[in-house]
Regions:
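Extended, charged catalytic domains and RNA/DNA-binding interfaces, predominantly
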Residues: 1-140, 151-160
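Active-site/ligand-binding-proximal alpha/beta "capping" segment
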Residues: 143
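Single conserved hydrophobic/aromatic residue that forms the stacking wall/gate
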Residues: 161-170
Length: 170
């Protein structure tokens, strides 16, 4: 499957009608930020310097989440801040995706998702696509990351996904 994705919604500007224009051009998934904050949401890069512009989604970002749902464009949560991800998984009426993230419990990297985030994505019905990039899998340099490291992340996420969620226990 090949899909057109937007790896940073910043170019959409401040005019929400641009969501439709991106959809008309074939965009089928969008990340509201990338390696920096956008007008829609904070990025996970804020962990490095402790900065946040919106404390998650901006008001414009909340509006765009609704429009992305309306047009059937998937919301990619691989780059936004933890608070942005929480808000997106709560606001989105459709499942979100993490198009290239791994398990933070196995590799503490801001781009990886922690157990709490994994549960939010699970509750939302979302999908996590792990990444095979070595620096997301391990901080080990010698030997470098390998297929076992990659599979460990997949196994970990699958185990968490098949465990009862807090909602299932009530």
């Amino acid at each position: 499957v090949i899909m057109i994705g937007v790896e940073n919604a910043y170019p959409m500007g401040l005019n929400t009608s641009n969501v439709r224009k991106f959809w008309e051009r074939g965009a089928r998934y969008v990340s509201l930020s990338h390696n920096g904050h956008s007008q829609f949401t904070d990025s996970n890069t804020g962990e490095f310097d402790g900065t946040a512009l919106h404390n998650g989604l901006s008001d414009l970002g909340k509006e765009v989440v609704e429009l992305l749902n309306y047009y059937g464009i998937m919301i990619d949560i691989s780059h936004p801040s933890k608070e942005g991800i929480r808000q997106m998984t709560e606001l989105s009426k459709a499942p979100v995706i993490a198009s290239h993230s791994s398990a933070r419990a196995l590799r503490d990297h801001p781009r990886n998702v922690d157990d709490e985030q994994l549960n939010w994505i699970k509750e939302n019905g979302g999908v996590i696509q792990t990444t095979a990039l070595g620096f997301f899998l391990t901080d080990r340099e010698d030997p470098p990351a390998n297929m076992d490291d990659f599979m460990d992340h997949i196994d970990y996420i699958c185990l968490l996904y098949t465990s009862p969620s807090p909602r299932d226990l009530h």
